């Protein structure tokens, strides 16, 4: 059985919304792959992330904002014959999003983006942010340039 392409936007959205953490791959300043887990928000096809004011990923994104974001869900181990190793497989659904990360610097926009992230985890989108907190947090958005989805066993 081959993986099938996930083409329907609704199924792609379902995979993205079903995971708590995504993994963002980038190329570091020495040309090496670098992957980090992130909390995220997703609304109207746009991804949102946040981080501290300094760090390796911030330095990377200033030089090369191109990323690949991975989401995977619905894992289920299965087999046809319990004692035959090659009959075992893993059901899954996955989505990859490619694009360029852009920093959000407008304070009102940062609050909106942070509330999109908070809504994913809390169900609420009406949080307050102190001025020092909203000034110090780095907020990023990614408008997808390319989206790929695959499912195996579903």
Predicted regions and their residues:
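Extreme N-terminal tail/first-helix region
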Residues: 1-18
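Broad gene-expression machinery/nucleic-acid interaction feature
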Residues: 21, 35-37, 66, 92, ...
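Short, structured patches in soluble enzyme cores that scaffold and shape functional sites
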Residues: 26-28, 71-73, 144-146
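Short beta-strand segments
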Residues: 19-53, 69
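Charged, gly/pro-rich active-site loop segments
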Residues: 2-3, 76-154
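Beta-strand-connecting loop/turn residues
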Residues: 45-46, 65, 145-147
């Amino acid at each position: 059985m081959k993986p099938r392409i996930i083409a329907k936007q609704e199924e792609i959205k379902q995979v993205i919304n079903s995971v708590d953490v995504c993994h963002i791959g980038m190329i570091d300043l020495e040309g090496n792959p670098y992957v980090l887990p992130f909390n995220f928000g997703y609304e109207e096809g746009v991804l949102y992330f946040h981080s501290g004011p300094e760090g390796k990923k911030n330095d990377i994104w200033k030089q090369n904002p191109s990323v690949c974001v991975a989401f995977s869900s619905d894992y289920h181990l299965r087999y046809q014959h319990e004692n035959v190793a090659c009959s075992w497989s893993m059901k899954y659904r996955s989505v990859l999003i490619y694009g360029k990360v852009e920093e959000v610097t407008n304070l009102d926009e940062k609050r909106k983006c942070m509330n999109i992230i908070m809504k994913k985890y809390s169900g609420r989108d009406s949080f307050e942010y102190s001025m020092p907190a909203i000034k110090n947090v780095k907020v990023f958005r990614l408008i997808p340039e390319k989206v790929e989805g695959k499912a195996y066993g579903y």
